[in-house]
Amino acid sequence: MPAALEIRGLTKSFPGFTLGPIDLTVPEGAIYGFVGPNGAGKTTTIDLIFGMGAKNAGEIKVLGLDHLRDEVAMKQQVGYVSPDLNYSPWGKVGRVIQFVKGFYPTWDDAYCDQLLRVLNVGKHERIMSLSFGARIKLSLILALSWRPTLLILDEPTVGLDAISKQEVFGELLKAVGDGERSVLISSHGLADLERFADHVGMIKRGKMIFEGSTADMIERHRIVDFVLGSDQGADRGHSIAKRDGVFVQRQEANRWRVLLDLKTAPLEWLRESGATQITEAPVTLEELFVAIGRE
């Protein structure tokens, strides 16, 4: 499958923090959830995609274009939404629409009007008077109205209530419905992403922990409860806890609860390690995020 965004071996060093090496692929036509704790490196990665800051190493291809050598051509096809964007100096919503429209020959007036109506933002409203959530909606309207091939959103649901989130994700689903557009979302709204994102990547302390289809990520992980007999000894428990793909949730005496990555730590291995009374339960994306994030 062609990639809308392909990152290979990306690194960036700061005092006290190193990003990468990062490998990340957003398939064409996908809604990709890019998740991780605060300070994990999500925004830094997005900044580097847009050439804000110099990477130490690695390659970034956006729609087959080098993100630096082909910067102008790239930015003509990539939309961006962030809570940090400030359109207040343009006064009213209609005025900033006219300003941004002038940069994009592909601007669709009818689509813009539709988005304004669906997301409940008025052209005559003063931007300074908009709520924080409404300003996020305005950023999304300005990014979607010229129908970019790739849309990159940094925390797009911050400040939105449940209904507004549904409206925003509904419009994103429509935007990628033809399979020719792709979306990368950096977000903490994991419950939303589980419903809408078909691919997910998790970053922690500057490193990618996993990446793949959302369904596969959820399917390959389980919350597992088990018992280790008192004759197993502390070394056996320590060995289980240190296995790749095992994330300890709780231990009380000889009773354990762990998150298992069945690809690297299958249930059969757990049985062979002496575990008994094994029960398993499916995991949500949020449970997966919390479990891996606390390790």
List PLM regions with ranges.
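Alpha-helix N-cap/helix-start and coil->helix boundary motif
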Residues: 11, 94, 190, 231-233, ...
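Short, surface-exposed beta-strand/loop "edge" segments at domain boundaries and coil↔beta transitions
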Residues: 151-156, 233-234, 264-268
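ABC transporter nucleotide-binding domain
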Residues: 169-262
